[in-house]
């Protein structure tokens, strides 16, 4: 039988130190973020000056990660990076749900120990996060390491009169404990539901928010759980805080409690872990759009019913669609992370996943990946050319040290507008166009040192903006991955483009040598019309994507 234990089974990165000086940028005064509970974009003010606490619901590690999972991770990674660029100390908690009905069922079907399966897929998720440049969380707690926290929280809810223990004919606790929704008048505030005893009301709200399906087509967030369908419930809306074990549950998937042997309900896990690491109230609770109801609605209710304040702001990332429809069974494994990475570089996949504002649906298509590859080519081309012109690149330390106050105003305005990544990306490419213009003028400038300083300033700004989105090609993990960031490896598409343009430039050079300037101009005009800028210099002609 499992044992209630103190939280010891989790990963911790560097925790923010209270001794570290805080230098919040002036740009932070303009930050506005959406709040699901209020349905409004509002000015962000941290609960503690200079610090931000964020809890994001992580994966239920039952199977391999798919693009929908990682989209949410990338979205909140960008949110986190913007807070860091603004100068805040950020405590970022992302949990791992490693005990769950589906984990138990799938492990049994595969002849595996449930905990071994959970750990195996947890590592797959970690590998996907790392490969796609998602920063490791400050704390990554596993549900199984926090049973005592959950039991304590449930006891507080019971003591406050907002839950009930189911007993058998002899008056002994069965292990089933439910939250009493009728006792909590604030239930429904997150998703703006009316208090009603009709279960259809909650179902209707859930339906309006879209289907809760994963890549296998299964109902991931609202599974048919015998505990939640039990006739022992006082109200159809009541949900399980603790669940009695099924006959098929392994002995090591059961924990002893004052209200019987069993295992936790899904919602209580996040309430317990967020309170453990972020305390009484924190700034932001995030997760995928599917989690608004019932998970986050239930989580908010039980946390407050235990006597603790809820998160000050709730943020939800929209899901990934294909041909206008949310990922579903019909897409099979085509959207699994390994299958996508087998065909595209990690930088390109990250760019595609983070290419729109987090609340916007993300349409996943071949065209989106082609556009992401083109973006990479434009970015890497400028960075490489600028580095050659300057004789070197700004260091990673210098790039990371650029404050939000020193970034281009249009980029800051976009990021402060509820993390409008589309606008921020447009600002980056505006800066790249300006930088390419400076590079084209470099050879003709009499004030060469001033000209180089301007190029360097443009290069530093571009890389700092990219870094804020987790996309600086000269940062980890892109450099270690051997991507084209360092010029040592190119995508097949870029290599083909390079070869075709080189052939055209050679033909143009031959025409100029033969004084056939009409043909030379014709070649240049054709390349320009195709979006390729040609620049002639003492060492020959170079090209860049406009």
UniProtKB/Swiss-Prot annotation:
Motif extent ('KMSKS' region): 326-330
Cofactor dependence: Zn(2+)
One term under GO cellular component: cytosol
CDD domains: CysRS_core
Cofactor remark from the record: Binds 1 zinc ion per subunit.
Residues the entry annotates as binding Zn(2+): 57, 270, 295, 299
GO biological process: cysteinyl-tRNA aminoacylation
Residue ranges annotated as motif 'HIGH' region: 59-69
Pfam (any one): tRNA-synt_1e
GO MF annotations, alphabetized: ATP binding; cysteine-tRNA ligase activity; zinc ion binding
Compartments (UniProt record): Cytoplasm
Binding-site residues for ATP, renumbered to this chain: 329
Annotated segments matching region Disordered: 211-236
Keyword vocabulary terms for this entry: Aminoacyl-tRNA synthetase, ATP-binding, Cytoplasm, Ligase, Metal-binding, Nucleotide-binding, Protein biosynthesis, Zinc
Enzyme class: ligase
Reactions it catalyzes: tRNA(Cys) + L-cysteine + ATP = L-cysteinyl-tRNA(Cys) + AMP + diphosphate
EC number: 6.1.1.16
PANTHER family: CYSTEINE--TRNA LIGASE, CYSTEINYL-TRNA SYNTHETASE
Subunit structure comment from the entry: Monomer.
Family affiliation: Belongs to the class-I aminoacyl-tRNA synthetase family.
Name this protein carries in UniProt: Cysteine--tRNA ligase
Lineage: Bacteria, Bacillati, Actinomycetota, Actinomycetes, Bifidobacteriales
């Amino acid at each position: 039988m499992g044992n209630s234990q103190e939280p010891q089974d989790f990963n911790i990165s560097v925790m923010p130190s209270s001794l570290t000086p805080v230098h919040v940028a002036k740009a932070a005064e303009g930050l506005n973020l959406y709040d699901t509970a209020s349905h409004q974009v509002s000015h962000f003010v941290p609960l503690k000056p200079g610090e931000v606490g964020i809890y994001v619901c992580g994966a239920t590690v039952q199977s391999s990660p798919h693009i929908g999972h990682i989209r949410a991770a990338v979205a909140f990674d960008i949110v986190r990076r913007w807070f860091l660029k603004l100068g805040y100390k950020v405590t970022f908690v992302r949990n791992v749900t490693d005990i769950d009905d589906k984990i138990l069922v799938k492990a049994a079907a595969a002849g595996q120990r449930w905990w071994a399966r959970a750990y195996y897929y947890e590592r797959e998720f970690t590998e996907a996060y790392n490969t796609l440049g998602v920063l490791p969380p400050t704390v990554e707690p596993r549900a199984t390491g926090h049973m005592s926290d959950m039991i304590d929280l449930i006891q507080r809810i019971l003591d406050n009169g907002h839950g009930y223990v189911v007993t058998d004919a002899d008056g002994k606790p069965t292990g089933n404990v439910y939250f009493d929704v009728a006792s909590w008048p604030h239930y429904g505030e997150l998703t703006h539901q009316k208090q009603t005893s009709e279960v259809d009301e909650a179902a209707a709200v859930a339906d309006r928010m879209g289907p809760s399906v994963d890549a296998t087509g299964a109902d991931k967030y609202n599974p048919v759980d015998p505990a939640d369908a039990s006739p022992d419930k006082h109200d159809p809306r009541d949900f399980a805080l603790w669940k009695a074990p099924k006959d098929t549950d392994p002995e090591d998937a059961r924990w002893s409690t004052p209200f019987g042997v069993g295992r936790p309900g899904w919602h209580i896990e996040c309430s317990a872990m967020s309170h453990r690491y972020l305390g009484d109230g924190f700034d932001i609770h995030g997760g995928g759009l599917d989690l608004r109801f019932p998970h986050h609605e239930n989580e908010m209710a039980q946390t407050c019913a235990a006597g603790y304040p809820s998160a000050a702001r709730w943020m939800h990332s929209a899901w990934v669609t294909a041909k206008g429809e949310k990922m579903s069974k019909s897409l099979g494994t085509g959207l699994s992370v390994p299958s996508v990475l087998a065909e595209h570089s990690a930088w390109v996949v990250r760019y595609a996943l983070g290419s729109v504002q987090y609340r916007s649906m993300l349409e996943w298509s071949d065209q989106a990946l082609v556009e992401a590859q083109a973006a990479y080519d434009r970015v890497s081309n400028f960075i490489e050319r600028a580095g050659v012109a300057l004789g070197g690149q700004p260091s990673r330390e210098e790039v990371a040290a650029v404050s939000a106050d020193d970034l281009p105003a249009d980029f800051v305005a976009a990021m402060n507008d509820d993390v409008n990544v589309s606008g921020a990306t447009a600002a980056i490419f505006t800066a790249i166009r300006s930088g390419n213009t400076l590079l084209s003028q470099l050879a003709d400038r009499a004030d060469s040192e001033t000209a180089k300083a301007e190029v360097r300033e443009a290069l530093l700004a571009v890389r700092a903006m990219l870094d804020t989105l987790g996309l600086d090609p000269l940062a980890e993990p892109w450099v270690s991955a051997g991507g084209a960031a360092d010029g040592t490896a190119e995508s097949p598409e870029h290599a083909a483009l390079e070869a075709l343009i080189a052939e055209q430039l050679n033909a143009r050079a031959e025409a100029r040598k033969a004084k056939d300037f009409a043909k030379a101009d014709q070649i240049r005009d054709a390349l320009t019309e195709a979006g390729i800028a040609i620049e002639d210099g003492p060492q020959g002609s170079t090209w860049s994507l406009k």
